[in-house]
Amino acid sequence: MASNSALLMKTIFLVLIFVSFAISPATSTAPEECGSESANPCVNKAKALPLKVIAIFVILIASMIGVGAPLFSRNVSFLQPDGNIFTIIKCFASGIILGTGFMHVLPDSFEMLSSICLEENPWHKFPFSGFLAMLSGLITLAIDSMATSLYTSKNAVGIMPHGHGHGHGPANDVTLPIKEDDSSNAQLLRYRVIAMVLELGIIVHSVVIGLSLGATSDTCTIKGLIAALCFHQMFEGMGLGGCILQAEYTNMKKFVMAFFFAVTTPFGIALGIALSTVYQDNSPKALITVGLLNACSAGLLIYMALVDLLAAEFMGPKLQGSIKMQFKCLIAALLGCGGMSIIAKWA
């Protein structure tokens, strides 16, 4: 079921890509610099190339550290998944994901889809970024809800013979063990849906920012951008790694999910380098494609951070039973959001 949900989200993103390329900018009245080489004196492809190659390996290592740290936390006594420290770290990582959606991905989408390089009609007459982010959040909600309910219904059918078909009786003393087990399985499924959908949104965003870095040749800003992206990927990986850990996948699946997260930004950088002769980040088609993808990623990340991560944690029995823990986790979430807000100055 979780794999079907991820497949649906991938299909939606692919449809958006095809739609963006189907929209023709042929009659554009954009300035001449749109889709052409920049006149910025800082642009130097020969000097930028070694920096971008270094960025591939540095960001790869930072991503591996970020996503791998939570996965190895079971081997550290004070970082057990049921402990207070791990809960605080999860809230910090959730704040990072929320900050990524609000401070990085969504503003980029607004900037791209309102660029002067795009036609006045329709791009400047309708807030496509906000609309698609909202739609993406609702679609994520639908997938999250339907995947859980379908699993619950399927599991309920499987235990009907033991319940003798009496779904309206108050025989809690007989069905309680089954219900607890069913609830545990449903929660595990939710963790798995969360991990897969969150990984999808992060991967799309990571490829996009990697592509942008690989295509740029601005030596005045590239060093700061690389440093910011290292912190960005490491902290974002912590959030994803925590979700993968809770999903209780097999070691092989954990490795595969961590691997794909770690390599997506370096892959995007390599792709940007390879396409740097033909890809122009200010061309209409590039702006539309990346802008639409960023809007969808933003809606997904914001929903996942607020609903499936922060709200689920704060409304759970652990935090509801301790005002002190609520305060600590709130501070951690604010620090995560604040950190990503600071990084937004450079990336």
UniProtKB/Swiss-Prot annotation:
Phenotype caused by lack of the gene: Plants exhibit a lethal chlorotic phenotype.
Signal sequence segment: 1-22
Alphabetized GO MF terms: copper ion transmembrane transporter activity; iron ion transmembrane transporter activity; zinc ion transmembrane transporter activity
PTMs per UniProt: Monoubiquitinated on several Lys residues. Monoubiquitination controls trafficking from the plasma membrane and targeting to the vacuole.
Location in chain, cross-link Glycyl lysine isopeptide (Lys-Gly) (interchain with G-Cter in ubiquitin): 154, 179
Induction, per UniProt: In roots by iron starvation.
First-listed, main subcellular location of the protein, grouped into a coarse class: membrane
TM annotation in the entry: 53-73, 85-105, 126-146, 193-213, 225-245, 255-275, 287-307, 327-347
Effect in UniProt of substituting residue 206 to A: Suppresses transport
Function: High-affinity iron transporter that plays a key role in the uptake of iron from the rhizosphere across the plasma membrane in the root epidermal layer. Acts as the principal regulator of iron homeostasis in planta. Also mediates the heavy metals uptake under iron-deficiency by its ability to transport cobalt, cadmium, manganese and/or zinc ions.
Oligomeric form and interacting partners: Interacts with FREE1.
Record-linked NCBIfam families: zip (TIGR00820)
Protein name, entry field: Fe(2+) transport protein 1
Organism this protein belongs to: Arabidopsis thaliana
Lineage: Eukaryota, Viridiplantae, Streptophyta, Embryophyta, Tracheophyta
